[in-house]
Amino acid sequence: MRTVWLLLAAAAALSAEPAGGTSCESLSKLALPHTAITDAQVVAAGGFVAPAGRGPAPSFKDVPSFCRVKATLTPSADSDIKIEVWLPASGWNGKFQAVGNGGWAGIISYGPLGAAVRRGYAAASTDAGHVGGSASFALGHPEKLTDFAYRAVHETTVAAKAIIANFYGNGPRYSYWNGCSTGGRQGLKEAQRFPTDFDGIIAGAPANYQMHLHVWSVAVAHAMHKEPGSYIPPEKYPAIHKAAFEACDSLDGLKDGLIQDPTRCHFDPKVLECKDADSPACLTEPQVEAARKLYAPVKNSRTGVEIFPGMEPGSELGWAGLAGPNAAAVATDTFTYLVYKDPGWDWHTLNPDTDTARADKNDKGLIDAIDPNLKPFFSHEGKLIMYHGWSDPLIAPGNSVNYYGSVAKKMGGASKTADEIRLFMVPGMGHCGGGEGPNTFDMVSALEQWVEQDHAPEQIIASHSQNGTVDRTRPLCPYPQVARYKGSGSIDEAANFTCATPTAP
């Protein structure tokens, strides 16, 4: 049966009008539950131009011809979920990939759609039910908040699979999710709430504990501004970064400009305290205390229970994202529009103890995706790859370590879950990419091999480039393993490293 399916899929992939399927334009007449298809047209190879959006537009010059389907989903009377499904006109690999959002969503993820189609995938993305990058859509619209929380992704997945089946004459043999940040949260929510939607999920730097994450984010701003003189201007970040590396870089036995495991380093920024006049090379006493707060977890002052982990040594060059002149709007929006429902809410008034409790009570697991019970997903033979940059300055990487640990504990231990979930921590990488570490890697191929061939990823080769040229490769290892130098050969070549359990500090 599998051979017959593969032959049919191969035949369909060789034709711009799929065998057994339908033409692109006729998809506009397709009737699906609470779905209005608003457009279906063929886009020539390299001919797609993304609508104006947030940030620079990616290039689509090398994207092959595809059928672009646009639709609006209305699972509730107040829903207005926009989706796009991109279907390769030829060369379909028989698979489906849904791609995630960032921040508060509000826009189609065109770049990831193009990346998926380049690989032969039929792909889908949603704006999560609203337009724009703030959470103002949620004020007075609980159904739209539900769409953002989980419903838009699930409904997009259901509609996309139906559209794929109509176009090609066959549904996808494998379905994958690929997202980072909010997209990581969306992926974990799918695994927890709709365990049969996907065969494999990639969840990078997930914002899955959003209520606590945003308490922490505002607390970072508090640390910078609560006391006179606490604010650390960006011109001081390089000095802190350098001092952190001097304290941490060689702890893994190799001084290579990377901190393999920052949790083993107990860097104290007091070493930078100004001895004479203030300068970009030192920190004043209030700034030392502020920096200490950034590295430390936010805890409940009464119980001592951790609310959210702190930043790690190595993240300093990206501190401006949360530790700037004002609290990050993506975080304050949670309290302005969801918790207090008051556009006039002042972030300076945040109390981590009481506001965390209030946010948790308000959310009730709607947005947060912290349920460690993934048994239904694993029973479906689902595979989950998580990854997170150790130098992420926007979502503390300890959050991914904590969630991974909670799943392992719930499911009977890490040894029992290694066949279903693996976490890859990336030294020197920032939020979803960038940074001084090996920040380019192919998680999709690793997941495909795991799901389709039952070959679990023992390591994933990552690279770092300078001016377009690869200057270092390094294996990423399943947590808690780290890349260990074999003792000979270039430290810039992955072949000279092996994945090993870290030794005791």
Regions picked out by a protein language model, each given a short descriptive name:
Residues 15-95, 111, 241, 254-255, ...:
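Catalytic-loop region of hydrolases
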Residues 179-189:
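Glycine-rich nucleophile elbow surrounding the catalytic serine of serine-hydrolase chemistry
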Residues 145, 189-191, 196-299, 425:
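A catalytic-pocket lid/entrance helix-loop region that shapes and gates access to the active site
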Residues 93, 101-172, 215-216, 223-226, ...:
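Cap/lid segment of the alpha/beta-hydrolase catalytic domain
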Residues 394-398:
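Conserved alpha/beta-hydrolase "acid-adjacent" motif
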Residues 386-388:
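Short beta-strand/loop motif that positions the catalytic acidic residue
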Residues 420-434, 448, 466-467:
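Histidine-bearing beta->alpha loop at or near hydrolase active sites
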Residues 170-181:
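Alpha/beta-hydrolase fold nucleophile elbow
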